[in-house]
UniProtKB/Swiss-Prot annotation:
Specifically methylates the N7 position of guanine in position 527 of 16S rRNA. It comes from Bordetella pertussis (strain Tohama I / ATCC BAA-589 / NCTC 13251). Keywords: Cytoplasm, Methyltransferase, rRNA processing, S-adenosyl-L-methionine, Transferase. GO terms for molecular function: rRNA (guanine-N7-)-methyltransferase activity. This is Ribosomal RNA small subunit methyltransferase G. S-adenosyl-L-methionine binds at G93, L98, I144, E145, R158. It catalyses: guanosine(527) in 16S rRNA + S-adenosyl-L-methionine = N(7)-methylguanosine(527) in 16S rRNA + S-adenosyl-L-homocysteine. It comes from the Bacteria. It is an enzyme of class 2 (transferase). The gene is rsmG. It is found in: Cytoplasm.
Amino acid sequence: MSAVPDIPGGPAQRLAQACDALRLPADAGQQQKLLRYIEQMQRWNRTYNLTAIRDPGQMLVQHLFDSLSVVAPLERGLPAAGSGARVKLFDVGSGGGLPGVVLAIMRAHWDVTCVDAVEKKTAFVRQMAGALGLPNLQAAHTRIEQLEPAQCDVVISRAFASLQDFAKLAGRHVREGGTLVAMKGKVPDDEIQALQQHGHWTVERIEPLVVPALDAQRCLIWMRRSQGNI
């Protein structure tokens, strides 16, 4: 996979150029919210340890740009997502809201719930929902397996668990015809094999991602229920 060259300049310039590289339109208001989100994450991180990444430049690339890279693939992969219809989305093991907060900023018609078992992380997401004016963003301080089935169009995770564990814990929150989507680094062949052997969910496709300024392999794993499993 070819890497996108590093982007010079300050955060605002780098963000604008990253959106251009991703062919992802972002108006001035959205860009301002994205930058405020990362700034607040840096501030909270000093006290609450939201993420192991401390460097502002690395946060911009490894958190913000990485999350932005899935917006267009989700729109292409979910017919309702690009039509303007409401989309119900769970972000499982969201931490400080990645990618959920970014998705809520970029798509106001996506109703995003960030689910995490660590209270300080969901408190941060709630703070961002208010501070950034995101009525389509909520946070749930709980384990995903403790929630009642949510009938989501899509449930997404980023560095949450193996594919089999993700499907086992979160699959019941996907409505009939919906999908599970896992953000991964290298294609996890062993995880895919374990998932397929389990039988309830199957990998529909593997979609490569190119994250601006990140020289690393990234992909999306799209999963659907196997026929006969509801």
